[in-house]
């Protein structure tokens, strides 16, 4: 039985428009059984990713390449 892992990141994503821009990227990175969401009301603009196989560094790199700060907590 595979279980999902929850990854938590501090990001510089601050606006819903930025989340919409990142949606295709995050949907492609996270497998079908996973999910992701931003908490833009949190002071650290938290990104939570629930996935079975995706390494945290893949998320960090993908956001950084697009100009956003991202670090795993």
Predicted regions: what is each one?
Residues 1-15:
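Short glycine-/aliphatic-rich beta-strand segments at the starts of folded cytosolic domains
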Residues 38-39, 55:
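Poly-acidic low-complexity segments
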Residues 45-49:
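A generic structural motif
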Residues 12-31:
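Short amphipathic alpha-helix segments
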Residues 6-10, 23-24, 50-73:
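C-terminal structural segments of small proteins and small subunits
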Residues 32-38, 71:
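A short linear hydrophobic-aromatic micro-motif
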Residues 4, 31-33, 63:
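Alpha-helical structural elements
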Residues 40-44:
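Short Gly/Ser/Thr- and Asp/Glu-enriched loop/turn motifs at secondary-structure junctions
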């Amino acid at each position: 039985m595979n279980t999902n892992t929850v990854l938590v990141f501090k990001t510089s994503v601050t606006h819903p428009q930025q989340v919409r821009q990142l949606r295709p990227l995050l949907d492609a990175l996270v497998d079908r059984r996973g999910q992701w969401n931003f908490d833009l009301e949190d002071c650290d603009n938290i990104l939570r990713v629930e996935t079975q196989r995706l390494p945290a560094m893949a998320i960090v790199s993908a956001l950084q390449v697009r100009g956003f700060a991202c670090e795993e907590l």
